[in-house]
C-alpha cells in the first residue's frame, strides 16, 4: 500500500495534489510520502517483534538526509556501504551504535573515519579486508565488533545484476571457508566476532531462497559456536521485493518474511538484524514529469517527457517496469492509446516504456512514474549536462523540498580549466 491516490480527479501524495507540487517546485521532481515510508518500516519492525532485533534501513535505496532522519526517529538503524552514506546517517542524527558498515571494498580511510566515530559493527567480506581492519583498529587502539559475510551459494531468482548470494558473485566469503576465516579472525588484534552476515540479492519475490540461505546460516552458527566463537547476532540482509506493476502478483509481505526468519534461526537466541531498502522506499516515491511533445512516428507514437534516463536509470539499466499514470484521473472507460514513453536524452535507450497504453495525453500534461522511491534519485546523473532534479517530502497536507533542483551554475562551477588552456 502507498499514499499516492486519486482524489477529486487528481493524483495526490497523501493530502497534497501533485499538480500543486509541479506548479511550485517544477518538473521533473521526486516526491516521497512520509506516511508510506513509516508504514513500511513499521511492518518490518512488527514482523520481528518476537525477539531482539534492529531494522537497519539500506541507505543506498534512497539516501536523502531527511528520509534517514524520518526513519531514524522511528527507531531504524542504518546499513551503509561507504563513508558518504555513513556521514549522511550521522548528519541525520543516527547514533553510531545503530549504524552497520557493509560493502565489499572498504578503504583504509573509510575504516579510520568509521572507527574514530564509532559503529555498531563492520561486516567483513574478505581475508584482506579483515587483516587491514585489524591493523587499522590496532593503530587506533579500538576493538571493533565484526561479522563475516558468508556467500551461501543460493540462487535468489532475481535480476543477475542484483543477485549477490551465488558462488560466482563478488560478495562475501564462500560458506565452505567460514570456519577457517573465523579461526583467523580470533587471532587478529582489534577485532571481536559478534555474528554472521548474509545477503543474497535484491527484489526477491519468493521466500524459498531466504529460507535456504538462513538454514545454512543456522547450521554454520552451531558449528562456529562449537568452535568457541560468540555468535550473538545474525545480520540477514534485505532483498524483499515490491510489485512494480499493479498487475503483478503480490510478493510476500514482511510478516511472512519474519515468520521464515523465526522458523529458520529463531531457536538460536541471536539478535536479528535485517537491511530492507527497496520495500521501505520503493513505493513511497514517484517521479513527477511533464509531457513536452506527443510525436507521431512511423508505426508508433511517442510521449516525450521532461524526465530522462539520467533521472531514472532503472528502465534503461535493468529493463525495469514502472507503472506510469496521468496526474489527472482519466474518465472511466476512456480510450487508450499505445505510446513509447521517452525522455529527451540523445540515446534510444532513454525509453521508460514501450507500447504502454495511456489515455489521451497532451503537451503540458503531468505524468507520474510510480514505485520510483528506491534506486531512483540515488542513481541519477548529469548525463547530457542535465541538472539533478529536486526531491520533495510530503507529510499529510504539508510538503518541503528536501533537495533543491541543481542549477546550471552549480553544475558547471565544479569544472576547472587548467592554466595552460587559459
Question: At which residue positions do the language-model features occur?
Answer:
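A charged N-terminal "starter" segment
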Residues: 1-145, 187-192, 219-226, 397-422
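Hydrophobic "anchor" residues on beta-strands that sit immediately upstream
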Residues: 56, 145, 233, 271, ...
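Short beta-strand segments
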Residues: 58, 145-151, 197-199, 235-237, ...
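Active-site-proximal loop/turn and secondary-structure-junction residues that shape catalytic pockets
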Residues: 61-63, 84-85, 105-106, 126-128, ...
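Short acidic, glycine/serine/threonine-rich loops at helix termini
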Residues: 67-68, 91, 111-116, 133-136, ...
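Conserved beta-strand positions in the central sheet of alpha/beta enzyme cores
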Residues: 79-80, 123, 147, 197, ...
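Active-site loop/helix belt of alpha/beta enzymes
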Residues: 152-295, 358, 384-386, 395
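Charged (often Lys/Glu-rich) extended helix/loop segments that serve as interaction or gating elements
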Residues: 260, 268-422
